[in-house]
Amino acid sequence: MTRLQRLFRIAWVFCRYRLDTFLPLSELPTPLKIFFLLAPWHLFPQPKLSRGDRLRLALEELGPVFVKFGQILSTRRDLLPDDMAESLKQLQDRVPPFPSEQARGIIEKSLGAPVSELFAEFSPDPMASASVAQVHAATLPNGQKVVVKVLRPGIEKVIRQDLGLMYLMAGLLEKYWSEGKRLHPVEVVADYDSTIHDELDLQREAANASQLRRNFENSPLIYIPFIDWDYTRKSVLVMERIHGIPIADVPALEKAGVNMRVLAEKGVEIFFTQVFRDSFFHADMHPGNIFVDVSNPADPKYIAIDFGIVGTLAPDDQSYLARNLLAFFRRDYRQVAQLHIQSGWVPPETRVNEFEAAIRTVCEPIFERPLKDISFGHFLLRLFQTARRFNMEVQPQLVLLQKTLLNVEGLGRQLYPDLDLWSTAQPFLEDWMRKRIGPSGLIKSLQNHLPSWLEQSPEMPQLVHDALLQIRSSGPTEAQNRATLALMKEQQLRSERRWRRGFIALVLAGAALVGSQPHAGQWLADLPVWSWALLAGAAGVMLRGSR
């Protein structure tokens, strides 16, 4: 299908479901007004469905690329009204499987050998089929039971074509719709572009799975299947076959005698462990991707699959998020506002008092509920919606995190309705903050950064000299040069004094921490030579800088 044919197909579906009623025709420029007035809307009576259901059915009819886009939009309640977001949550990826002969051809081309040589057994009937790939059961020559994920043929071309049209429509909305500049539709499509292209590379998914498996090796919380890298390529992924009960099958879990409270609390612990310990989290934890190992019903274990979408948080984002959540539950709305400004999530010129008042208006009603009924995910959602009114830039990593948290909460309360997320999460957050900003955190930071500082310190005089020469040659008057040089020297001296004081404070904190340990003397004697060398080098830099 050509791009023009596809565009007409999209327009036809829009007409069929009367999506014209969503558009602010009065705000459109004259050419677009004429187009919409001449379009054959009158041939289609308005369906007796809610606007959310009409949008959902239209996206399903347009195919897998639009379905996936709708699924992502369902988590963006800062962009869509609640009723439409709820309807989009029901979107189903209804894609028929492609013939097994095609799957075999892709496997043989990718792995360079016949399927009969690669596998002792290969099921021609797919276990599951989705928009991007389908999965077959197989057995390796060594007897290992595996699943083989095969990329759908031609999917890259389909995605490229539909994304081009999405960018076109988003660009028109951003240019001609009054809300377009605030909601950044082009940015939304760009985020989706990045997400869906990540899913097209099965080697990337395999790498994500390997990282998560390493992070949770021997963990009692969750099991990640191993990847067979000898059989994995960009279009083919071979992974250990797992056995468990789907987490959404609550009757089966109850019949197996699973402790539902423990299972729900483990889900919360898994989420916070990924976000704050590892800064690497499975960002597609919907019920279809989670199973439960019930071999020990009193202490059940999660099993995760489908690692195409993962999220990461920078250390600063981790810190601001943890401090935001802790400040929220202390009802310290001023700190919440200040943290948003300090993090750069909202512009620095934002008025703290106004922002604090807006946050209070949103958050106070939440505290009228029992703690067990407070939703972290909806808190973040309402907070981001409020921040958008103050020109908060879209933070893709936080959008992924909020979506994942909503999934985790939904699962947890489906399993155990009285789940109190705060009592489960608070100790984790407070412990993480103590480790990050306490003496041990300072010493760890010093250990990580001191070698780099020592390596760069010999270059500092030359850098300062070069900067001064550049100022001298830039053309100001001699008096201006002298004033600038004097100011720079004073700033340099102040910086050196602060650096020395900070270093001394770190050493004293480290000494206090070491001194509090049993057998401190023996511990110091056992320190490796390189540790003493680093400390001696740092002291030398201090003495040299103090002259």
From Swiss-Prot:
The active site is at 284 (proton acceptor). ATP binds at residues 127-135, 149. It is a multi-pass membrane protein. It holds the Pfam family ABC1. It comes from the Bacteria. It is found in: Cell inner membrane. Belongs to the ABC1 family. UbiB subfamily. This is Probable protein kinase UbiB. It comes from Marinobacter nauticus (strain ATCC 700491 / DSM 11845 / VT8) (Marinobacter aquaeolei). The gene is ubiB.
